[in-house]
Protein backbone atom coordinates (compact mmCIF):
# COMPACT_ATOMS: atom_id res chain seq x y z
CA UNK A 1 0.00 0.00 0.00
CA UNK A 2 2.82 2.42 0.97
CA UNK A 3 4.75 1.62 -2.22
CA UNK A 4 1.71 2.38 -4.35
CA UNK A 5 1.18 5.68 -2.52
CA UNK A 6 4.81 6.66 -3.10
CA UNK A 7 4.55 5.84 -6.82
CA UNK A 8 1.33 7.82 -7.18
CA UNK A 9 2.71 10.88 -5.36
CA UNK A 10 5.91 10.78 -7.40
CA UNK A 11 4.00 10.50 -10.68
CA UNK A 12 1.69 13.36 -9.77
CA UNK A 13 4.56 15.56 -8.65
CA UNK A 14 6.49 14.87 -11.85
CA UNK A 15 3.48 15.62 -14.02
CA UNK A 16 2.69 18.85 -12.21
CA UNK A 17 6.25 19.99 -12.81
CA UNK A 18 5.94 19.11 -16.48
CA UNK A 19 2.69 21.05 -16.80
CA UNK A 20 3.57 24.09 -14.68
CA UNK A 21 4.57 27.36 -16.39
CA UNK A 22 7.73 27.67 -14.34
CA UNK A 23 11.42 27.42 -15.09
CA UNK A 24 13.59 24.54 -13.92
CA UNK A 25 17.33 24.34 -14.58
CA UNK A 26 17.02 27.19 -17.05
CA UNK A 27 14.36 25.48 -19.16
CA UNK A 28 10.73 26.49 -19.30
CA UNK A 29 8.46 23.47 -18.93
CA UNK A 30 5.29 23.22 -21.04
CA UNK A 31 2.27 24.85 -19.46
CA UNK A 32 -1.37 23.89 -19.78
CA UNK A 33 -2.96 26.40 -22.16
CA UNK A 34 -6.52 26.85 -23.31
CA UNK A 35 -6.21 29.01 -26.41
CA UNK A 36 -8.24 29.02 -29.60
CA UNK A 37 -8.98 25.46 -30.70
CA UNK A 38 -7.86 23.92 -27.41
CA UNK A 39 -10.09 21.44 -25.60
CA UNK A 40 -11.53 22.65 -22.33
CA UNK A 41 -11.76 20.28 -19.34
CA UNK A 42 -14.44 17.61 -19.77
CA UNK A 43 -15.07 18.77 -23.35
CA UNK A 44 -14.14 15.43 -24.94
CA UNK A 45 -15.41 11.93 -24.37
CA UNK A 46 -14.04 8.59 -25.54
CA UNK A 47 -15.22 4.99 -25.41
CA UNK A 48 -13.02 1.90 -25.60
CA UNK A 49 -13.57 -1.84 -25.92
CA UNK A 50 -10.89 -4.41 -25.23
CA UNK A 51 -9.79 -7.50 -23.33
CA UNK A 52 -7.61 -8.14 -20.27
CA UNK A 53 -7.18 -10.78 -17.52
CA UNK A 54 -10.04 -8.95 -15.77
CA UNK A 55 -12.40 -9.87 -18.61
CA UNK A 56 -14.00 -8.13 -21.56
CA UNK A 57 -13.66 -4.46 -20.75
CA UNK A 58 -15.54 -1.31 -21.62
CA UNK A 59 -13.96 2.04 -20.80
CA UNK A 60 -14.98 5.68 -20.90
CA UNK A 61 -12.61 8.62 -20.56
CA UNK A 62 -12.75 12.40 -20.51
CA UNK A 63 -10.03 15.02 -20.64
CA UNK A 64 -9.06 17.14 -17.63
CA UNK A 65 -6.28 19.03 -19.39
CA UNK A 66 -3.50 18.26 -21.86
CA UNK A 67 -1.70 16.06 -19.32
CA UNK A 68 -4.55 14.33 -17.48
CA UNK A 69 -7.50 12.11 -18.43
CA UNK A 70 -10.05 10.57 -16.08
CA UNK A 71 -10.96 7.01 -17.06
CA UNK A 72 -13.62 4.59 -15.83
CA UNK A 73 -13.47 0.85 -16.52
CA UNK A 74 -15.95 -2.02 -16.31
CA UNK A 75 -15.04 -5.69 -16.80
CA UNK A 76 -17.25 -8.76 -17.28
CA UNK A 77 -16.59 -12.37 -18.24
CA UNK A 78 -17.97 -15.82 -17.41
CA UNK A 79 -16.72 -19.26 -18.41
CA UNK A 80 -17.89 -22.73 -17.39
CA UNK A 81 -16.00 -26.00 -17.64
CA UNK A 82 -15.86 -29.47 -16.10
CA UNK A 83 -12.63 -31.22 -15.20
CA UNK A 84 -11.33 -34.00 -12.96
CA UNK A 85 -8.33 -33.65 -10.67
CA UNK A 86 -7.07 -36.10 -8.05
CA UNK A 87 -10.23 -38.16 -8.59
CA UNK A 88 -12.58 -35.24 -7.87
CA UNK A 89 -14.83 -34.03 -10.67
CA UNK A 90 -15.48 -30.30 -10.57
CA UNK A 91 -18.11 -28.38 -12.52
CA UNK A 92 -16.48 -24.96 -12.32
CA UNK A 93 -17.56 -21.48 -13.32
CA UNK A 94 -15.29 -18.45 -13.61
CA UNK A 95 -17.06 -15.19 -12.83
CA UNK A 96 -15.22 -11.92 -13.49
CA UNK A 97 -17.02 -8.69 -12.60
CA UNK A 98 -15.20 -5.52 -11.60
CA UNK A 99 -15.31 -1.77 -12.06
CA UNK A 100 -12.84 0.98 -11.30
CA UNK A 101 -11.33 4.31 -12.22
CA UNK A 102 -7.88 5.59 -13.14
CA UNK A 103 -6.13 8.91 -13.56
CA UNK A 104 -4.19 8.77 -16.83
CA UNK A 105 -1.10 10.96 -16.51
CA UNK A 106 0.73 12.00 -19.70
CA UNK A 107 4.00 13.64 -18.57
CA UNK A 108 5.09 14.29 -22.15
CA UNK A 109 3.26 15.28 -25.31
CA UNK A 110 3.20 11.66 -26.45
CA UNK A 111 1.21 8.49 -25.90
CA UNK A 112 3.21 7.36 -22.86
CA UNK A 113 1.24 7.38 -19.64
CA UNK A 114 1.23 6.37 -15.99
CA UNK A 115 -2.14 5.45 -14.50
CA UNK A 116 -2.74 5.09 -10.75
CA UNK A 117 -6.24 3.91 -9.93
CA UNK A 118 -8.45 1.47 -8.05
CA UNK A 119 -11.05 -1.24 -8.53
CA UNK A 120 -13.99 -0.02 -6.49
CA UNK A 121 -16.13 -3.07 -7.24
CA UNK A 122 -14.54 -6.52 -7.37
CA UNK A 123 -16.56 -9.75 -7.48
CA UNK A 124 -14.00 -11.94 -9.24
CA UNK A 125 -14.24 -15.57 -8.17
CA UNK A 126 -14.37 -19.20 -9.25
CA UNK A 127 -17.12 -21.48 -7.95
CA UNK A 128 -17.36 -25.24 -8.37
CA UNK A 129 -19.59 -28.18 -7.51
CA UNK A 130 -17.51 -31.23 -6.61
CA UNK A 131 -18.47 -34.90 -6.91
CA UNK A 132 -16.69 -38.22 -6.46
CA UNK A 133 -18.58 -41.23 -7.87
CA UNK A 134 -19.27 -43.94 -5.29
CA UNK A 135 -16.63 -46.66 -5.17
CA UNK A 136 -13.88 -44.52 -6.72
CA UNK A 137 -10.76 -43.14 -5.08
CA UNK A 138 -9.57 -39.57 -4.65
CA UNK A 139 -6.60 -37.93 -3.00
CA UNK A 140 -6.22 -35.06 -0.55
CA UNK A 141 -2.77 -34.00 0.64
CA UNK A 142 -1.30 -37.12 -1.02
CA UNK A 143 -3.60 -39.38 1.02
CA UNK A 144 -5.95 -41.78 -0.77
CA UNK A 145 -9.60 -42.01 0.25
CA UNK A 146 -12.64 -43.72 -1.26
CA UNK A 147 -16.08 -42.32 -1.93
CA UNK A 148 -18.80 -44.49 -0.38
CA UNK A 149 -21.52 -46.10 -2.43
CA UNK A 150 -25.06 -45.01 -1.67
CA UNK A 151 -26.53 -47.17 1.10
CA UNK A 152 -30.08 -46.66 2.34
CA UNK A 153 -29.42 -48.69 5.50
CA UNK A 154 -26.41 -46.73 6.76
CA UNK A 155 -27.40 -43.47 5.11
CA UNK A 156 -24.12 -43.36 3.20
CA UNK A 157 -23.88 -41.19 0.08
CA UNK A 158 -20.99 -40.55 -2.32
CA UNK A 159 -18.63 -37.68 -1.53
CA UNK A 160 -19.81 -34.33 -2.89
CA UNK A 161 -19.40 -30.66 -2.06
CA UNK A 162 -18.59 -27.17 -3.25
CA UNK A 163 -15.61 -24.87 -3.57
CA UNK A 164 -15.04 -21.14 -3.92
CA UNK A 165 -11.82 -19.44 -5.03
CA UNK A 166 -12.04 -15.78 -4.13
CA UNK A 167 -10.03 -13.22 -6.10
CA UNK A 168 -11.53 -10.28 -4.26
CA UNK A 169 -10.09 -10.21 -0.74
CA UNK A 170 -9.56 -6.44 -1.04
CA UNK A 171 -12.99 -5.12 -1.98
CA UNK A 172 -11.23 -1.91 -3.11
CA UNK A 173 -8.05 -2.91 -4.90
CA UNK A 174 -5.49 -0.22 -5.74
CA UNK A 175 -3.87 -0.50 -9.16
CA UNK A 176 -0.97 0.99 -11.07
CA UNK A 177 -0.38 0.62 -14.79
CA UNK A 178 1.69 2.15 -17.52
CA UNK A 179 1.16 2.05 -21.23
CA UNK A 180 1.00 3.77 -24.57
CA UNK A 181 -1.91 5.37 -26.33
CA UNK A 182 -4.37 8.12 -25.52
CA UNK A 183 -8.09 7.39 -25.68
CA UNK A 184 -8.46 11.12 -26.43
CA UNK A 185 -5.82 11.66 -29.15
CA UNK A 186 -4.56 15.07 -30.23
CA UNK A 187 -5.41 14.21 -33.84
CA UNK A 188 -8.13 11.99 -35.24
CA UNK A 189 -10.74 10.03 -33.34
CA UNK A 190 -9.51 6.44 -33.28
CA UNK A 191 -6.75 5.16 -31.00
CA UNK A 192 -5.42 1.79 -29.88
CA UNK A 193 -4.43 2.04 -26.20
CA UNK A 194 -2.26 -0.60 -24.52
CA UNK A 195 -1.39 -0.91 -20.85
CA UNK A 196 0.39 -3.24 -18.44
CA UNK A 197 0.45 -3.25 -14.66
CA UNK A 198 -1.21 -4.86 -11.66
CA UNK A 199 -4.03 -4.58 -9.13
CA UNK A 200 -3.47 -5.37 -5.45
CA UNK A 201 -6.48 -7.64 -4.91
CA UNK A 202 -5.17 -9.31 -1.74
CA UNK A 203 -4.25 -12.96 -1.17
CA UNK A 204 -6.75 -15.30 -2.85
CA UNK A 205 -9.02 -17.35 -0.59
CA UNK A 206 -9.93 -21.01 -1.01
CA UNK A 207 -12.94 -22.55 0.72
CA UNK A 208 -13.79 -26.21 0.06
CA UNK A 209 -16.68 -28.01 1.75
CA UNK A 210 -17.04 -31.75 1.23
CA UNK A 211 -19.84 -33.96 2.49
CA UNK A 212 -21.13 -37.47 1.95
CA UNK A 213 -19.35 -40.55 3.25
CA UNK A 214 -15.66 -41.31 2.94
CA UNK A 215 -13.83 -44.63 3.37
CA UNK A 216 -10.25 -45.62 4.03
CA UNK A 217 -10.43 -48.83 2.01
CA UNK A 218 -11.82 -49.83 -1.35
CA UNK A 219 -13.90 -52.59 0.24
CA UNK A 220 -15.66 -49.86 2.24
CA UNK A 221 -15.35 -51.60 5.61
CA UNK A 222 -14.01 -48.52 7.39
CA UNK A 223 -16.22 -45.55 6.52
CA UNK A 224 -17.65 -42.44 8.11
CA UNK A 225 -19.51 -39.28 7.33
CA UNK A 226 -17.00 -36.76 5.96
CA UNK A 227 -18.14 -34.19 8.49
CA UNK A 228 -17.90 -36.52 11.52
CA UNK A 229 -14.65 -35.44 13.13
CA UNK A 230 -15.48 -37.62 16.15
CA UNK A 231 -14.85 -40.64 13.93
CA UNK A 232 -11.18 -41.36 13.07
CA UNK A 233 -12.06 -41.74 9.38
CA UNK A 234 -13.90 -38.42 9.19
CA UNK A 235 -11.21 -36.72 11.27
CA UNK A 236 -8.48 -37.98 8.92
CA UNK A 237 -10.39 -36.79 5.86
CA UNK A 238 -11.05 -33.34 7.36
CA UNK A 239 -7.40 -32.96 8.39
CA UNK A 240 -6.22 -33.89 4.88
CA UNK A 241 -8.69 -31.42 3.36
CA UNK A 242 -7.53 -28.55 5.58
CA UNK A 243 -3.88 -29.24 4.76
CA UNK A 244 -4.70 -29.43 1.05
CA UNK A 245 -6.55 -26.10 1.23
CA UNK A 246 -3.50 -24.47 2.81
CA UNK A 247 -1.33 -25.76 -0.06
CA UNK A 248 -3.74 -24.39 -2.65
CA UNK A 249 -3.74 -21.00 -0.92
CA UNK A 250 0.06 -20.94 -0.95
CA UNK A 251 0.21 -21.90 -4.64
CA UNK A 252 -2.25 -19.12 -5.53
CA UNK A 253 -0.64 -16.44 -3.34
CA UNK A 254 1.22 -14.76 -6.27
CA UNK A 255 -2.20 -13.72 -7.64
CA UNK A 256 -2.53 -11.20 -4.80
CA UNK A 257 -0.76 -8.92 -7.29
CA UNK A 258 -3.18 -9.52 -10.13
CA UNK A 259 -1.69 -8.86 -13.58
CA UNK A 260 -3.28 -6.35 -15.92
CA UNK A 261 -2.39 -6.50 -19.61
CA UNK A 262 -4.97 -4.93 -21.87
CA UNK A 263 -5.42 -3.66 -25.38
CA UNK A 264 -8.36 -2.34 -27.33
CA UNK A 265 -9.75 0.20 -29.75
CA UNK A 266 -11.11 3.60 -28.70
CA UNK A 267 -13.16 6.31 -30.37
CA UNK A 268 -13.30 9.88 -29.10
CA UNK A 269 -15.89 12.63 -29.57
CA UNK A 270 -15.42 16.40 -29.50
CA UNK A 271 -12.66 18.79 -30.56
CA UNK A 272 -8.96 18.08 -30.45
CA UNK A 273 -6.22 19.08 -28.04
CA UNK A 274 -3.52 21.32 -29.35
PLM regions: where:
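Transmembrane beta-barrel domains of outer membrane proteins
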Residues: 38, 50-52, 59-61, 104-106, ...
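Outer-envelope beta-barrel architecture signal
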Residues: 39-45, 56, 66-68, 110-112, ...
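Cleavable N-terminal export/targeting peptides
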Residues: 1-36, 230, 270-274
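Membrane-embedded beta-strand positions of outer-membrane beta-barrel proteins
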Residues: 47-49, 60, 72, 103, ...
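Transmembrane beta-strands of outer-membrane beta-barrel pores
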Residues: 51-55, 74-80, 107, 118-124, ...
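Extracellular/periplasm-exposed beta-strand and loop segments of Gram-negative cell-envelope proteins
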Residues: 33-40, 74-101, 123-172, 202-260
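Outer-membrane beta-barrel strand-turn architecture
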Residues: 64-68, 105-110, 182-186, 269-273
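Outer-membrane beta-barrel "beta-signal"
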Residues: 255-274
Amino acid sequence: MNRIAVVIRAALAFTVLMAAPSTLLGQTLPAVRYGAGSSRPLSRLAFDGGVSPLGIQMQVATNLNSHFNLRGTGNLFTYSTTFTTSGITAAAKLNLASAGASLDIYPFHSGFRISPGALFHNQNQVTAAATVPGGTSFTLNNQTFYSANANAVTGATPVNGSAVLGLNTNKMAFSITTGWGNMIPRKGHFSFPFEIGAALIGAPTVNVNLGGWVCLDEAQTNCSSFSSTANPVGAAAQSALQTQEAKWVKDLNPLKTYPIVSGGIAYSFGGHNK
